[in-house]
């Protein structure tokens, strides 16, 4: 039978139990009485692996954070770890069957991501919030005061390096819905629905039922829950206690209600405590004299408490310390009572490790649940007074996460949190990338993995410069085009290919002429470069040989090196003859491999230039020609709005020669504007420090994937990227596929261990024994 509400002050519906009056579109929440609250979400920062100085800086900033709130502002810190049910792996990672030959690879890739996802802790979404509560006469007064408080709070998070934003009304409702629906369920809400339906915002977040019939547990729908409080009995608290609570299994919500005490009242309170302790000390001394004992022998607790109280008084009077009251709550949710007890026991073990006690609330489970909601309401009056420094030891930071939306791709697991690292490099200010690692550390495999996911999850083009013929099996399996450049090959690429979009200037010949100058300089082998007259005759010849093509842009009108040589000879001056004679070896001589029109399809989405077969004399111009072919493709794709990824293995080979190094620096400088995403893989970072021009490649790379590093290279990376000694441990004698990721100034340790019993792993691996075994299996 439904009981009617008769003004008895009790909650008669689930909605009545949720302790707020209303939430407004701007995120302002009206509580009972004259209290109002707002919630701010903030991101994690790299604390655990930061150096001692950086950790100290974060700690001091956290002290300033708490000191910035006067006693009229309530502060509620909320740390949530909640399991979110996902659909099939293709829904989560965007890898869907297409009904073609790549579906087995797609299934492998999706399965591997699902394996890594479940192996890590990504089923659990970890979020952090601070809810601020004030008292105000009305909505207008509350909004006016919160305007200043929000700005100050966001600035304090910025100082700590944590991104933060104020939740609007819908975001707050979604947050509450997630907590009140621990079994999952989609949140659907729109402000326009309220008036026609006659419903309140509570109707969109309320669970099916609350049950508070038991003394130490409660139920939300079919889920079981329990709220405990932390008894801080340890003389000192470790800064990892919060993070270890959040690393326990199961749905957990850690709440810290913090309220500052007026400084004068705090000092008076401590002085009264000292006076009481002194009175107890005098009483003990009198008792000792009467009993014939030494009056200096006092109970140890009395001496300890007296010294601690005087230290606190000194901190309050002469240091930047304030006093706060803290209520520390831990709420668990589980599908069964047994799972709930296991989760609570795990958290209790963490508390015991740090000499604290996690005690279940008796007969206060409803108040505990409502106090755990990020509303800024605290009904549990179990408080512990702490100074600013003691409070700030509860550091809410562990490690930053990289879990982006859009066309994000997998780059391993965060070695600290076990969460997937999903990035969309194209969202970066500068998506250029570098991969560093000693031989056998996994450089090529990491590039292959990224290439695979680009092909499977985007519509972008990929071009590979492959000096060691390591990528051909993967490229063929993914339906790509392998172009073998060697004197014995019939795969020809014309170095003089051009398209009308070759430059963003009106005249595309300007940039093409620059390439031809670099090519001629390379084959002439002059240490001092081309002379001014030589540059003039080359440019004059370039202008002439492209006239037929621009007049009638058909493939058969595209010039080749032989046409360039003839145009030089036709000028009849010694400087032109000298350049023509240098070209003769590449036109009529034994190195005439590049004196042909292009015979291969470089319009395929995936193209691999295999340059292993180019001899010593052809490899240098060959690498330059590949770079120019890449530029051609990038300009074509830019016109149709498609990105082009360019992977260069053994990148140091390009950096050795002045011409290819200069061309590489130009690519790293200009590719972003043209929709290009270059990535260079090499062993040693010092290869990029040989000149200021090459050094710009490192400066212009916001994605750096660091595998195992030699000692000298570790030092270079630490200085250049600001890597701490603790972080460097992840690139010191690390296993293959393990290291550090630098992305947009975020540095994360990662682990990328692929299951080996898959077709995809066999395509990615570069270990000789595994490659041979895969080849034998295919035959």
Task: List the predicted regions and their residue ranges.
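Extended, folded cores of ATP/NTP-driven motor/assembly subunits in large transport
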Residues: 1-399
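P-loop NTPase motor domains
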Residues: 45, 52-71, 78, 82, ...
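Hydrophobic anchor at the beta1->P-loop junction of P-loop NTPases
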Residues: 435
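P-loop (Walker A) phosphate-binding loop of NTP-binding proteins
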Residues: 438
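Walker A/P-loop NTP-binding active-site region of P-loop NTPases
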Residues: 441-494
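Conserved AAA+ ATPase "SRH/arginine-finger" region at the nucleotide-binding site
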Residues: 483-488, 703-712
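H-loop/switch region of ABC-family ATPase nucleotide-binding domains
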Residues: 682
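Conserved P-loop NTPase
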Residues: 721-777
């Amino acid at each position: 039978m439904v009981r009617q509400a008769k003004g008895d002050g009790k909650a008669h519906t689930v909605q009545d139990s949720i302790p707020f009056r209303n939430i407004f579109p701007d995120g302002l929440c009206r509580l009972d009485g004259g209290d109002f609250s707002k919630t701010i979400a903030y991101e994690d920062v790299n604390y655990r692996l930061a150096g001692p100085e950086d950790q100290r800086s974060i700690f001091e900033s956290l002290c300033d954070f708490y000191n910035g709130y006067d006693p009229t502002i309530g502060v509620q810190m909320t740390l949530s770890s909640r399991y979110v049910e996902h659909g099939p792996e293709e829904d989560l990672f965007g890898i869907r069957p297409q009904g073609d030959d790549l579906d087995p690879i797609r299934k492998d890739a999706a399965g591997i991501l699902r394996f890594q996802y479940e192996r890590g802790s990504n089923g659990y979404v970890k979020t952090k919030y601070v809810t601020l509560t004030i008292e105000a006469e009305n909505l207008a007064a509350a909004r006016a005061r919160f305007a200043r408080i929000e700005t100050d709070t966001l600035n304090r998070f910025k100082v700590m390096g944590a991104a933060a934003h104020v939740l609007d009304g819908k975001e707050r409702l979604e947050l509450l819905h997630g907590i009140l629906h621990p079994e999952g369920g989609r949140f659907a809400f729109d402000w326009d629905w309220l008036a026609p339906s006659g419903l309140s915002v509570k109707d969109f977040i309320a669970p099916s039922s609350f049950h508070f019939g038991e003394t130490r547990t409660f139920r939300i729908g079919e889920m079981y829950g329990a709220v405990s409080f932390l008894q801080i009995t340890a003389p000192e608290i470790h800064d990892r206690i919060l993070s270890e609570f959040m690393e326990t299994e199961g749905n957990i919500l850690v709440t810290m209600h913090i309220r500052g005490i007026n400084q004068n009242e705090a000092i008076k309170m401590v002085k009264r405590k000292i006076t009481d302790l002194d009175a107890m000390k005098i009483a003990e001394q009198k008792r000792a004299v009467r009993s014939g004992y030494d009056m200096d022998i006092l109970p140890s607790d009395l001496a300890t408490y007296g010294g601690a109280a005087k230290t606190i008084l000194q901190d309050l009077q002469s240091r930047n310390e304030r006093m706060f009251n803290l209520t520390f709550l831990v709420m668990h949710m589980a599908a069964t009572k047994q799972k709930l007890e296991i989760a609570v026991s795990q958290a209790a073990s963490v508390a015991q490790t740090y000499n604290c006690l996690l005690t279940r609330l008796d007969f206060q489970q409803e108040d505990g649940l409502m106090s755990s909601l990020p509303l800024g309401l605290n009904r549990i009056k179990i408080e512990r007074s702490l100074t600013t420094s003691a409070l700030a030891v509860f550091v809410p930071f562990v490690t930053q996460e990289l879990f982006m939306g859009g066309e994000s791709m997998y780059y391993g697991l965060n070695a600290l949190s076990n969460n997937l690292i999903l990035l969309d490099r194209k969202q970066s200010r500068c998506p250029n990338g570098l991969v560093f690692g000693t031989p056998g550390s996994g450089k090529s495999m990491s590039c292959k993995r990224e290439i695979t996911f680009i092909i499977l999850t985007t519509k972008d083009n990929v071009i590979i410069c492959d000096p060691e013929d390591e990528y051909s099996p993967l490229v063929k399996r993914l339906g790509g085009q392998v172009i073998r450049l060697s004197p014995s090959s019939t795969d020809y690429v014309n170095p003089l290919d051009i398209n009308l979009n070759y430059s963003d200037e009106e005249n595309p010949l300007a940039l093409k002429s620059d390439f031809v100058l670099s090519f001629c300089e390379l084959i002439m082998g002059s240490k001092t470069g081309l002379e001014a007259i030589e540059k003039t005759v080359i440019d004059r010849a370039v202008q002439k040989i492209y006239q037929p093509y621009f007049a009638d842009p058909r493939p058969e009108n595209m010039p080749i090196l032989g046409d360039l040589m003839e145009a030089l000879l036709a000028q009849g001056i010694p400087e032109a003859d000298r350049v023509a004679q240098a070209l003769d070896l590449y036109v009529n001589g034994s190195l005439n491999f590049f004196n042909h029109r292009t015979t291969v399809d470089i319009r395929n989405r995936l193209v691999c230039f295999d340059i292993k077969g180019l001899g010593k004399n052809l490899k240098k111009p060959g690498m330059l020609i590949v770079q120019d072919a890449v530029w051609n493709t990038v300009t074509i794709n830019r016109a149709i709005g498609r990105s082009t990824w360019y992977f260069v293995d053994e990148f140091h080979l390009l950096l050795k020669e002045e011409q290819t190094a200069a061309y590489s620096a130009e690519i790293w400088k200009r590719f972003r504007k043209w929709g290009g995403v270059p990535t260079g893989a090499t062993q040693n970072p010092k290869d990029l420090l040989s000149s200021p021009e090459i050094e710009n490649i490192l400066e212009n790379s916001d994605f750096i994937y660091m595998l195992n590093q030699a000692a000298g290279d570790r030092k270079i990376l630490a200085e250049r990227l600001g890597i701490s000694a603790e972080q460097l441990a992840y690139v010191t004698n690390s296993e293959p596929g393990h290291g550090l990721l630098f992305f947009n100034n975020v540095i994360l340790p990662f682990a990328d261990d692929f299951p080996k019993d898959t077709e995809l792993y066999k395509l990615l691996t570069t270990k000789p024994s595994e490659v041979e075994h895969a080849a034998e299996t295919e035959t």
